[in-house]
């Protein structure tokens, strides 16, 4: 499996049976699967979408109340699914070009990508259980 280091964006090849062995980046030594949510920019998102893991992106804005309420749920699920799914946030205020590129019209909008392609989308904040169920169905 190829995976992108969230710290330096280097592509790392990891045998599938070693994913849970605290894999580290070959370039910078950062943990590859730390369960952290990645704040993506226009510069980093395309690289992250090349990851062999599914990528879940939360398009949000700092002024959006539902976005702020959903953030801890997104972070909890990212921790729980570490090494299985990448979780990414895109600030639509700071990254307007990405909002336009992905056709974001309401926030929060959560999109799932596999092999760089959108496979599902969810508009609006949801509680943790429905979010988990949606991920299970979509992944």
From Swiss-Prot:
It comes from the Bacteria. Its EC number is 1.8.1.8. It catalyses: [protein]-dithiol + NAD(+) = [protein]-disulfide + NADH + H(+); [protein]-dithiol + NADP(+) = [protein]-disulfide + NADPH + H(+). The keyword Disulfide bond applies. GO terms for molecular function: protein-disulfide reductase [NAD(P)H] activity; protein-disulfide reductase activity; zinc ion binding. Keywords: Cytoplasm, Disulfide bond, Electron transport, Metal-binding, NAD, Oxidoreductase, Redox-active center, Transport, Zinc, Zinc-finger. The keyword Metal-binding applies. It is an enzyme of class 1 (oxidoreductase). GO terms for cellular component: cytoplasm; cytosol. A zinc finger (unnamed) spans 5-18. It is found in: Cytoplasm. Signal peptide: none annotated. Disulfide bonds join 64-67. Residues 26-139 form the Thioredoxin domain. Efficient electron donor for the essential enzyme ribonucleotide reductase. Is also able to reduce the interchain disulfide bridges of insulin. This is Thioredoxin 2. It comes from Escherichia coli (strain K12). The gene is trxC.
